[in-house]
């Protein structure tokens, strides 16, 4: 098999699976902040129980998501040495900031939040969760800064065949960044809202004891999902203008701007196929179709009145069975964004075939199989653990459980008089 194809398949596999963990993390942490803030402000134990229950699911996903991220980093280092050599001075800056500032701070805040239950004041404990959320969004921001540079290189100059950063501010004002970041963040909120609504619907279908608790989380999830899908659609369609101006070939080569750019590339780099594969447009089309389908969540909101959504029960099944849709949509969107810039890894600068490492096809195939099996195992483990802990209900989650009182000795020794 072709080494380049294997490398691209490996990139698609590792980044797509990791991205599923990322959107769950971003979506749930936002809802957790709201629930814990409600507990701190009102003192209502219902909000504490909801925070502990959903926080436990968040921690499971976060821990296994770190493992998938490490696999993705190995994949980058092994397969794309040409990318690191040519654009590492530019591309590496936002990635370094994301790792050193955002990720390490996020992990530190999360660890203190996990072990700070019943040890820290409510306000301090809530501030730690705010720190987790802010640094999580900071991580997403810097990752999108790096990816947007690959989509539309700005603020650089090429010296001795290597790209060097000349304008850091240009990275932050990249036309490819703003709407894409809003699209990703709103997609994460959609995933978090749908996950919360679907799990709550499952408990309400089964008529588990915590009816009032899951009734509340169903409402939170549905309202979040409805608002988020509107944001997703807005940011998504708003991207067409900026993307069309900086990447004319993304939506095909049959327009004057694309033909002029392809002619320029042919002169500079020689003859070749400079239009992206049809997979980009197919993925985009299916993503839009799923997006409009998820927009029907708005039709469920009136049924929240007097709990008609629970009385009818059929809408609960729709919510539960619709849970995979936002996950499929985010993967299709990511594929469309990445495949749409082909045959470039850095648009108009470095072709994908020039970025791949000089690795033999058998070795590349071996790493593809190994990483795919490892990531598949992590993904299945994550969903099994999430399903198991979600099904147990909110009676007594392990997260935030009060410490057991010290046990009395079985035979107390007589006191000396």
Residue ranges of model-derived segments:
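Polytopic transmembrane helical bundles with strong interfacial aromatic enrichment
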Residues: 1-417
